[in-house]
Each structure stands twice: as structure tokens, then as C-alpha cells.
Amino acid sequence: MIRSASFRAIGATALLGLGLGGLFASACRQKAAPAPPMATPSVTLSREKVPLGGPVDITYKFVVAAGATFTQNYRVMVHVVDPNEELMWTDDHDPPVPTTGWKPGQTVEYTRTVFVPVYPYVGDATIQVGLYGQPNQPRVPLAGEDMGQRAYKVGRLQLAPQSETVLSVFKDGWQAPEAAEHNAAVEWHWTKKVATLAVKNPKRDSVLYLDLDNPGGVFEESQQVTVSTAAGTPLDQFTLTPKRATLRKIPLPAAALGADDNVDLRIAVDKTFVPSRLSPSSKDPRELGVRVFHAVVVVLAP
């Protein structure tokens, strides 16, 4: 009886071992080796603490793996998430050099200026980067900390209250604000021939980030834009081409801003237009100059 019982126990153990071995072998066969990373992403920020609504220059860098070959063009996915991994905003974009032009071992580096949305949150945020193609395709494997679905953690950003930015007010010479039909976060003001931006004088060397365009369609002529102080001190002059968004980073020396607590900056254009006079289908009687999306003063670090 003991021998028989021992036999049955040994037989059951052997069968169990064979069964588990088969399961492990099957699992090993089913689990594919991870795909090798195609590149290593990283970002560098011009400043790590940014007030809501303020600009930050983000330098993206991709170090292409030695054996990597990109056979299609991918977009760069940029997600900014809060500590609970909730998505706050995105900055997806096409890299200036299409990924089919990336070479093994090459370093691809470029800088974009992002204006932080006025989001109902202040505190730490995480920047995630990825590469994606068609909607149903998996994202490209990259080297780094995968936060899920090949979204890789590349940096952190501290969001500060909007009150920490230099106060500026659209004073005179502006049309009422407008917003994009399908994205209320995209807002702009049209100028008239001369528009005044009232700024609380930082009394330090600063930079005016002026983000503007002429969308074209109705008015297709280039415009000369001049930025100066109310006292007439010239700060910048440039040509604005229709259908081409322009970001000007205009130096504001403390000496040019003067000693008053507030200073007016003037944006003047040489040509304005009235849509209803140029297009029979338009009923817009306003005088329009250029379309300004952002006009933000940033104090330079000491």
C-alpha cells in the first residue's frame, strides 16, 4: 500500500512537472523579445519653472540607434501630464528633419517655443515623448523610462501661477478677442493700424515674445511691422508674410523701458484691410492689421 501510494505520488509529481514545463515553454514561445530601441529621446528646457500662459523653449534631441532605419515619417508625440498621469496638453509636431532622413548614429536636435496653456493646475508636470505613425500602428520603441504605450518620460516642468508673469494688458487699438471654432484654447486679438500693449515695467532686461500672423485668404499682401516704446524708441521691425506664423523674441533693454512703473509698447503695421471691402462674401467691417496670439514679456535671468 505504501509502495502504491508512493508510486501514485511520484507519478502525479512527474505529470505536474511535465505540465508546468509545457506551460513555461509555451509562455516563452508566446512572449516575444522586446523590440530594440530606434532612438534615445531627451529634452532641455530654457527654464524649469514657467507661469501659466508663459513661454518656454524646449530643445528636443533624438540620438538614433546605430542599427536603426526609419522607413516612414513619424510625428513626435509630446504629452504633458500631472502627477496623476492626467493629460493636460499636447504639443505633437513633425520634426524639422523627417524621420526617413534620420541616419544611424545621428543626433537630431531642434528647439520649439511652447506657450503653456492657462490650465487649472499649478505644480509639477511630466513631459512624455514618443514617435507615432498611422493611427492603428504601435508607437516606435525608444530608449528610456516607458510610462506605458511607448510614451517615454524625458523631463519635468514646474507650473507656476499666472500671477508670476509680467502683467500686460491689451490697451488701445485692438479688436475684441476671438477663439478658434474647434479649439477654444487658441485665442487671438487683431490689431488695428497701431495697437498698444501696456506692461508693468520689470525694470530689468527682458524679452517680448510676440506670436503673430496674417492668415491670408482675404488680404494677401506682406506687411511691415514695427515695435517701439510709446516714447518712440525702436525695438524691432520685420516683414510679415501672409499664411506664415511668426514668433519674434524682441529684446527689451531696461534702459529702453525707462523708470516709470508702467510702460506702453506699440505695434504698428504699414497696411491694414477691411474684409467686407475686399470680399463680397464678407460682412466684416473691422479694420484689421495683424493677428496676435501671444504677447508675453519674460524677464531675463540675472
Identify what each model region corresponds to.
Residues 1-8:
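N-terminal secretory signal peptides that target proteins for export/translocation
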Residues 11-22:
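Bacterial N-terminal signal peptides
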Residues 28-302:
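C-terminal luminal/periplasmic domains and tails of membrane-associated envelope-modifying transferases
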